[in-house]
A protein has these predicted regions:
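Residue-level signal for inorganic ion chemistry
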Residues: 8, 34, 91, 104, ...
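Conserved beta-loop-beta/alpha segment of the NTase-like Rossmann-fold superfamily
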Residues: 74-76, 82-141, 160
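Short, well-ordered secondary-structure micro-motifs
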Residues: 61-64, 88-89, 112-113, 139-144, ...
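Conserved N-terminal catalytic core of the sugar/cofactor nucleotidyltransferase
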Residues: 35-97, 178-183
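Conserved alpha/beta core of the MobA/IspD/sugar-nucleotide pyrophosphorylase nucleotidyltransferase superfamily
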Residues: 158-235
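Short, flexible, basic/aromatic active-site loop/helix in glycosyltransferases
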Residues: 140-165
Length: 235
């Protein structure tokens, strides 16, 4: 029997929002952005949720998110770090499940279908990430804007979250990365969990189908887009 844990990351500062309220706590249709993904995990077959937030926001999350919305599956609210990988590492310390889904709390439009595909994909392949094929032609350019080349679009995916793994594998990968950083290796440019697996394990990471609506709320316009998608889904 698999035990499934979700880590929801909500420790970002949201500087691109140009708003005093952090993006994960801004409201969409009367509820904070972070609530939407927590609620989806709450009603899914996930067994426990670890919420990772800024140290200064722990009490707020406990009172205004967990207690206010009666979220029973949240096992703990823990402090994140200054970088995403530090927040994930802190969250992994609290995981008791053998499968873990790591999700950006700034992606409020996750749904149960995505969660199920993530779980089943991890059971079959040990490591998987949610994504969607790119629709546009993508080009690489140099610092001055001159085109270097045009990658084959059929091989390109937009990477989303959750990113899901057998817990022992991702813990091992993060441990190895932390050791490298402590040695002073500053050449690492890690932007998501799949990259940690790619860099520090021999396991292949597989894509599972996501949803083009599974956007990350980063700018003020994204709040409007998320509201529109929620309204359309309600019809």
């Amino acid at each position: 029997m698999n035990k499934i844990t979700a880590i929801v990351l909500a420790a970002g500062s949201g500087s691109r929002m140009k708003n005093k309220t952090k993006k994960q706590f801004m409201e969409i249709k009367g509820k904070p952005v972070i609530w939407y993904s927590l609620f989806e995990f709450e009603k899914s077959r996930v067994d426990e949720i670890i919420l990772v937030t800024g140290k200064e926001d722990i009490d707020y999350c406990k009172k205004e998110i967990v207690e206010k919305y009666n979220l029973k599956k949240i096992k703990n609210v823990v402090a994140g770090g200054s970088e995403r990988y530090e927040s994930v590492y802190n969250g992994l310390k609290e995981v008791t499940g053998n499968i873990v889904l790591i999700h950006d709390g700034a992606r409020p439009l996750i749904n149960n279908e995505i969660i199920e595909r993530s779980i089943e994909g991890t059971i079959k392949s040990d490591a998987c990430v949610v994504g969607v094929p790119v629709k546009d032609t993508i080009k690489r350019a140099d610092k001055e804007g001159y085109i270097i080349d045009t990658p084959n679009r059929s091989e390109l995916w937009i990477t989303q979250t959750p990113q899901s793994f057998k817990t022992d594998l991702v813990k091992m990968a993060y441990k190895k990365m932390k050791e490298e950083l402590e040695k002073g290796n500053t050449t690492l440019n890690i932007t998501d969990d799949a990259m940690v697996m790619e860099e520090f394990t021999t396991n292949q990471v597989r894509f599972v189908q996501g949803d083009y609506k599974n956007i990350k709320v980063t700018t003020p316009e994204d709040i409007d887009i998320a509201e529109l998608f929620i309204e359309l889904d309600a019809k």
